[in-house]
């Protein structure tokens, strides 16, 4: 299976090209549009006056819903991004955002380092990680108020844990959302997805069942998050979200249950968030790959059957000779086209 990487390779390539051109004394005039998953667009540009300064702007469908996520009002999305990027070498935050985009960063090529390039290439993931960070903070608060029983994490119960009505929603696609529900012993991530046809539903169900079975078979991944698949909203959502009637028959809910072991450290926390933000793309990509593989196999079988039928055809000259020979026993052939000898 293909594991998608969170970084945008086109951004990395563009920035490295700009740095190399600046070192050679011939800086590039930059005006590039770079696309990413989930209706995300980047714009990398500079001005003719100073080509060593780049602007990286991003526009994503999830921006409005993510910026609305609040915990206690002390941390906003803009402050979260400023804290993350202001400490990087060669990256500053301009006072104005480029028109038509949601967020803009200013890049000084002469001071840019590889770590800054890597962080710039995951800008979309950093934006989407904001509600996850809030949910983990809320989990810590709830767990201190009401510690979870030890057996809750061991059994991985499917019933909603104790908590309040805090729910973070990421509206990142048309009619598809990500719901993040913190509680006192876990953080529940719920993906709302829509399948295009019945075939996608079948492949999706088989694909997710393999997630469950592989977790049971392999001891090395038994500590992975629990995966649940349902037609109806899970218990965590029933009182807080009412799905629209549009595409009701094609709507499904995929639930991941994260326990403290999945976000103990900052590195592990970011790795888990990256995997979750890319799950929908990973999931539907492999559904399409499975359908393409099935179609190629069917085409191969049809081609092999056509070859068999072509070999079974009777040549016109042979057929005339057999008909003109008076009294000759009519020749019979097998399905491969060979004559039967008596």
Curated annotation (Swiss-Prot):
The record's GO molecular-function terms, alphabetically, read: actin filament binding; calmodulin binding; molecular adaptor activity; structural constituent of cytoskeleton
Taking the first listed entry, what is the main subcellular location of this protein, grouped into a coarse class?
cytoplasm
Q: Which GO terms describe its biological process?
A: actin cortical patch organization; actin cytoskeleton organization; actin filament polymerization; actin nucleation; Arp2/3 complex-mediated actin nucleation; microtubule cytoskeleton organization; protein localization to cell cortex; receptor-mediated endocytosis
Q: Where in the cell is it found?
A: Cytoplasm, Cytoskeleton, Actin patch
Q: Which UniProt keywords apply?
A: Actin-binding, Cytoplasm, Cytoskeleton, Phosphoprotein
Phosphoserine: modified positions: 324
Q: Name one GO cellular component term.
A: actin cortical patch
Q: Which residues carry this modification: Phosphothreonine?
A: 155
- InterPro entries noted in UniProt: ARPC2, ARPC2/4
**Signal sequence residues:** none
Additional remarks: Present with 13400 molecules/cell in log phase SD medium.
PANTHER family from the entry?
ACTIN-RELATED PROTEIN 2_3 COMPLEX SUBUNIT 2 (PTHR12058:SF0), ARP2/3 COMPLEX 34 KDA SUBUNIT (PTHR12058)
Family under the similarity heading:
Belongs to the ARPC2 family.
Assembly and oligomerization: Component of the Arp2/3 complex composed of ARP2, ARP3, ARC40/p41-ARC, ARC35/p34-ARC, ARC18/p21-ARC, ARC19/p20-ARC and ARC16/p16-ARC.
Give a short account of what the protein does.
Answer: Functions as actin-binding component of the Arp2/3 complex which is involved in regulation of actin polymerization and together with an activating nucleation-promoting factor (NPF) mediates the formation of branched actin networks. Seems to contact the mother actin filament.
Its protein name is Actin-related protein 2/3 complex subunit 2
**Source organism (scientific name):** Saccharomyces cerevisiae (strain ATCC 204508 / S288c) (Baker's yeast)
Gene behind the chain = ARC35
């Amino acid at each position: 299976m293909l594991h998608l990487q969170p970084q945008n390779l086109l951004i990395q390539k563009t920035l490295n090209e700009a740095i190399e051109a600046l070192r050679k004394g011939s800086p590039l005039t930059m005006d590039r549009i770079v696309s990413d998953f989930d209706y995300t667009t980047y714009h990398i540009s500079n001005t003719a006056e100073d080509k060593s300064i780049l602007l990286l702007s991003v526009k994503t469908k999830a921006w409005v819903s993510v910026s609305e996520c609040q915990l206690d009002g002390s941390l906003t999305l803009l402050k979260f991004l400023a804290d993350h990027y202001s400490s990087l070498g060669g990256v500053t935050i301009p006072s104005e955002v480029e028109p038509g985009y949601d967020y803009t960063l200013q890049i000084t090529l002469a001071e840019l380092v590889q770590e800054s390039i890597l962080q710039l290439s995951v800008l979309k993931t950093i934006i989407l990680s904001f509600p996850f960070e809030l949910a983990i903070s809320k989990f810590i608060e709830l767990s201190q108020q009401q510690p979870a029983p030890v057996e809750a994490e061991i059994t991985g119960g499917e019933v909603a844990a104790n908590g309040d009505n805090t729910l973070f929603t990421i509206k990142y696609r048309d009619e598809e959302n990500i719901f993040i529900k913190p509680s006192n012993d876990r953080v529940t991530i719920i993906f709302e997805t829509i399948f295009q046809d019945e075939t996608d539903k079948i492949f999706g169900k088989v694909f997710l069942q393999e997630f469950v079975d592989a977790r049971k078979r392999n001891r090395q991944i038994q500590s992975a998050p629990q995966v649940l698949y349902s037609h109806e909203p899970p218990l965590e959502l029933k009182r807080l979200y009412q799905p629209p009637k549009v595409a009701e028959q094609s709507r499904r809910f995929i639930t991941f249950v994260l326990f403290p072991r999945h976000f103990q450290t900052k590195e592990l926390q970011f790795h888990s968030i990256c995997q979750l933000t890319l799950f929908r793309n990973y999931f539907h990509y492999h559904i399409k790959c499975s359908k393409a593989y099935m179609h190629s196999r069917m085409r191969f079988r049809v081609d092999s059957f056509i070859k068999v039928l072509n070999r079974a055809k009777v040549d016109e000259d042979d057929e005339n000779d057999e008909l003109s020979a008076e009294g000759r026993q009519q020749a019979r052939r097998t399905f491969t086209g060979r004559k039967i000898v008596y």
